[in-house]
């Protein structure tokens, strides 16, 4: 059987690459527990932040272990790193009191108050025994009391977590404050001094340690899971990845007002709800809601960004539906009339999986507005919406987090076989489960590395982020081009940003540019060894003064990362590493905190306006790369118009409020639609079209699929030869994205995958296959569903197409 020989080849590759020892039920059980732990820790921290929005202090405190503590650096002492002046509170009861007191009237409960708490960009480190963990996060709070007072606080968490019984708890929440201020004046460095590097709990090498296969480790205490339970739980993780990607992709389409792509993501009766007003089901209802944001496409001066933060996902036990919950902050503006808005929304979206194709779609986008404010007036006085006299009711929290003290089982006991790609002979099940688990851990390892990079670049630690790259990995230096290898990346960075950046323990810095790498869409290869990442770069910063010059960094810039990551074997170690790092920036920026992204006029009521600030990276650069040419220049003619308008690219340059093109590494995840206007740049790394030997596929890695494999199927009744009589001719056409090759066999079955096999056919070069079925094989007078299955290959996803036939 050709079909299974394809699968076997893949399985062997995985076994060789990722496991020294054979995959067993025990090793899978242990690895699964590790990955589920990493996810639960993220869910704990993200839900903690979600609870703050609604002043649920008791529940927030219930996430702490009984002897867990909170240390909240006050930043008034000699040194932010010095614990001695940090508030130190132990135990859930005292922590609840502290949280409540700290929020005061800015608790999200008082009429007009706002308590937005963001925790993002996690680097999670699980201990070897799987019982404790550390996590670094960005933390940012936008708060207001509705009566004119506001607070902004930003900094870094270096937290610790412990497995207590069945659940992960916070054992230490350690906050290092870096900047603070108010809506009126913006923010600046706490203490008005230079800021140290907050110690990292990881090294570049450690940041890439795979989650799985941590041998030797403690012997498993519990019993091993059954194969069925493993299938169930691993499938749920795989599906969770798809859901998260879909929600985050939707956000990017909304930002660019790509309404056709947004609508493609919905079921035929999909809806959008805002504050419980729900659109009529279907495309026209969706279109009318989307049109309220404006017509399709962005024109000069329009900002429609909706960054998505701290998404948590809960799968239904049957794996056919899911809820995604999180925070979306609309940053809306029209530069032409100098108007802008903040829109703080909780979302709680419902998604469903099409059981036929296994493709996830949106059933309902559901937004509950926390607060909407004009940029000029801000959120301190309650904004313009919603007018609310009583405290808001939070949309339900996920994953049993509303009662975190109770010992809820971490996963349902029941199971159902949810293998996306059909059934395999038992002997192939365990290696295939290992591959599926690796695909999900690739998601978290990619986020880990992405976040680790984000923190290092904030602190401009050249050698540290150089070392996050693979030996043959490459990184773009904005406006210049790509440098390949950790040492060349490090040298380029130091040449550009100056010698202080090479020191592991640099002097305090007057200003820090923050790179929030959030809203990740991670496309994982079939074997789980490589991934393609799209991420938002929401750049902000802090400085000594909030209101002047470069140090007046309390504004925002927007960019997009297009990266790839690989599992590299080097000097006997296996590590997840950055293969390719590319940033397209800046799509927009705030001239200052005062004026925001739409040049809002706040001069009458606020502090003096700040001088217009050009690209932050450029300003910060103190050196020059003239004597250190890149391996690939963004001026390379082979890029064509790819970098036209971007800093360093071919003229004319395009800067906000003009609109730069936005590029895509994937097709629409539901419809397979290819982004128009030459903005599709996939598959493969951005500089790969200039350097084909940089393609993953030329380096022993698989290129992740860029979207669904679509199968359209036709059936016609034709005259067979005399002996057979009439036949049903079934024709299938398979398609994926440009430059994605479909090859292999397709099967025709009557009904589902375990039902009758009616034929197996090799695809032709155009992706067509045709089957001839004797009419007598189908029940006369009855509709038969004929299904064409494709197992996928190392470049494209599996697919399924069906046709109903009445003979
Ligand atoms: C907290 O309690 C756990 C279990 O009782 C114990 O293992 C741990 O050492 C304690 N932590 C601290 C900081 O006391
Ligand atoms: C949408 O349509 C599907 C299929 O017809 C149906 O099962 C489902 O109940 C509908 N959902 C809503 C919210 O109308
Ligand atoms: C500015 O233009 C937008 C449309 O882009 C409109 O919605 C908004 O009301 C206008 N604001 C002002 C203050 O005129
Ligand atoms: C949207 O969310 C609100 C608030 O949680 C809820 O009351 C409403 O039922 C949801 N709407 C849909 C269509 O799910
Ligand atoms: C939480 O769970 C515990 C233990 O199951 C139970 O005693 C308690 O009443 C629950 N609390 C809430 C608010 O549901
Ligand atoms: C993240 O990096 C740490 C080292 O800092 C490593 O131990 C851990 O396994 C990685 N976690 C994930 C989720 O990749
Ligand atoms: C910060 O502001 C003070 C006045 O408030 C000014 O003297 C100082 O030069 C400013 N520093 C910077 C770095 O702009
Ligand atoms: C199905 O039939 C229609 C009409 O004859 C034709 O346009 C289309 O190309 C066919 N599709 C396939 C997959 O054969
Ligand atoms: C597959 O089809 C067979 C035969 O029609 C049926 O008995 C079986 O329940 C189906 N299985 C699933 C998972 O739908």
Tell me the role of every PLM-derived stretch.
Residues 132-134, 154-203, 207, 321-323, ...:
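Short beta-strand edge/turn micro-motifs at domain boundaries
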Residues 20-50, 54, 58, 62-66, ...:
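Short, low-complexity N-terminal intrinsically disordered segments enriched in polar/charged residues
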Residues 141-151, 180, 330-341, 372, ...:
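Short, cysteine-centered beta-strand-loop-beta hairpins and adjacent loop/turn segments enriched
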Residues 57-139, 259-330, 462-543:
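A solvent-exposed, acidic/Ser-Thr-rich amphipathic alpha-helical stretch
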Residues 1-20:
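Fungal secretory targeting signals
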Residues 177-180, 185-225, 370-372, 377-427, ...:
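A hydrophobic membrane-anchoring alpha-helix module
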Residues 704-807:
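Solvent-exposed beta-strand/loop surfaces, strongest in extracytoplasmic domains of secreted
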């Amino acid at each position: 059987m050709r079909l299974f020989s394809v699968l076997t080849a893949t399985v062997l590759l995985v076994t060789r690459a990722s496991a020294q020892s054979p995959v067993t039920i025990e090793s899978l059980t242990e690895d699964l527990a590790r990955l589920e732990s990493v996810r639960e820790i993220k869910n704990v921290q993200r839900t903690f932040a979600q609870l703050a929005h609604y002043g649920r202090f008791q529940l927030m405190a219930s996430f702490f272990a009984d002897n867990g503590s909170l240390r909240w650096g006050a930043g008034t002492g000699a040194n932010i790193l010095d614990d001695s002046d940090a508030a130190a509170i132990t135990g859930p009861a005292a922590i609840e009191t502290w949280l409540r007191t700290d929020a005061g009237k800015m608790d999200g409960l008082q009429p007009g108050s706002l308590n937005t708490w963001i925790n993002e960009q996690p680097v999670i480190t699980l201990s070897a025994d799987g019982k404790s963990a550390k996590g670094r996060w960005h933390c940012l709070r936008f708060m207001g009391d509705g009566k004119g007072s506001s607070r902004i606080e930003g900094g870094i968490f270096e937290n610790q977590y412990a497995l207590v019984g069945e659940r992960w708890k916070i054992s230490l929440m350690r906050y290092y404050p870096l900047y603070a201020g108010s809506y009126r004046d913006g923010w600046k460095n706490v203490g008005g001094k230079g800021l140290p590097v907050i110690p990292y709990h990881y090294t570049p090498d450690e940041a890439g340690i795979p989650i799985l296969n941590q041998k030797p480790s403690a012997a498993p205490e519990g019993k091993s899971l059954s194969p069925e339970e493993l299938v169930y739980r691993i499938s749920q993780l795989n599906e969770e990845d798809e859901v998260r990607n879909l929600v985050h992709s939707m956000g990017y389409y909304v930002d660019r007002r790509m309404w056709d792509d947004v609508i493609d993501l919905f079921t035929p009766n999909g809806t959008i709800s805002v504050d419980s007003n729900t659109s009529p089901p279907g495309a026209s209802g969706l279109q009318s809601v989307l049109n309220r944001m404006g017509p399709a496409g962005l024109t000069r001066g329009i900002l429609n960004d909706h960054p998505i933060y701290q998404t948590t996902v809960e799968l239904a036990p049957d794996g056919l539906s899911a809820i995604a919950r999180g925070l979306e902050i609309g940053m809306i503006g029209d530069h032409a009339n100098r108007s802008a808005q903040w829109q703080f929304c909780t979302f709680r979206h419902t998604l469903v999986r099409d059981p036929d194709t296994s493709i996830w779609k949106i059933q309902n986008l559901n937004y509950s507005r926390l607060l909407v404010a004009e940029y000029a007036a801000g959120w301190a006085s309650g904004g313009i919406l919603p007018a609310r006299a009583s405290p808001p009711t939070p949309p339900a929290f996920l994953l049993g987090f509303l009662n975190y003290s109770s010992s809820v089982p971490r996963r349902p006991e029941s199971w159902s076989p949810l293998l996306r790609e059909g059934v395999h002979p038992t002997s192939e099940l365990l290696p295939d489960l290992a591959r599926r688990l690796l695909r999900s851990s690739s998601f978290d390892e990619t986020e880990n590395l992405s976040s680790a990079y984000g923190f290092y670049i904030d602190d401009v630690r050249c050698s540290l982020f150089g070392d996050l790259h693979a030996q043959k990995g490459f990184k773009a230096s904005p406006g210049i081009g790509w440098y390949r290898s950790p040492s060349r990346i490090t040298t380029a960075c130091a040449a550009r940003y100056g010698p202080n950046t090479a020191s592991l323990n640099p002097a305090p810095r007057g200003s820090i540019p923050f790179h929030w790498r959030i809203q990740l869409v991670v496309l994982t290869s079939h074997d789980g060894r490589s991934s393609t990442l799209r991420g938002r770069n929401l750049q902000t910063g802090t400085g000594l003064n909030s209101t002047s010059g470069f140090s007046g960094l309390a504004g925002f810039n927007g960019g997009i990362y297009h990266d790839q990551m690989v599992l590299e074997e080097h000097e006997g170690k296996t590590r997840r590493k950055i293969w390719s790092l590319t940033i397209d920036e800046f799509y927009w920026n705030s001239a200052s905190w005062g004026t925001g992204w739409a040049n809002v006029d706040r001069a009458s009521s606020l502090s003096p306006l700040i001088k217009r600030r050009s690209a932050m990276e450029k300003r910060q650069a103190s050196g020059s790369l003239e004597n250190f040419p890149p391996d690939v220049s963004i001026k390379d003619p082979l890029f064509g118009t790819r970098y036209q308008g971007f800093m360093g690219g071919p003229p004319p340059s395009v800067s906000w409020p003009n609109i730069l093109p936005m590029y895509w590494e994937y097709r629409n995840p539901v419809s397979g639609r290819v982004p128009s206007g030459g903005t599709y740049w996939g598959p493969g790394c951005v500089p790969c079209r200039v350097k084909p030997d940089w393609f993953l596929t030329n380096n022993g890695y698989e290129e992740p699929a860029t979207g669904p494999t679509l199968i359209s199927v036709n059936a016609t009744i034709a005259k067979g030869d005399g002996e057979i009589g009439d036949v049903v001719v079934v024709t299938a056409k398979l398609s994926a994205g440009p430059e994605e090759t479909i090859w292999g066999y397709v099967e025709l079955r009557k009904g589902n995958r375990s039902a009758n096999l009616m034929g197996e056919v090799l695809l032709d070069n155009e992706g067509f296959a045709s089957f001839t079925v004797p009419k007598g094989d189908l029940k006369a007078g009855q509709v038969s569903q004929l299904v064409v299955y494709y197992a996928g290959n190392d470049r494209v996803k599996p697919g399924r197409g069906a046709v109903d036939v009445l003979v």
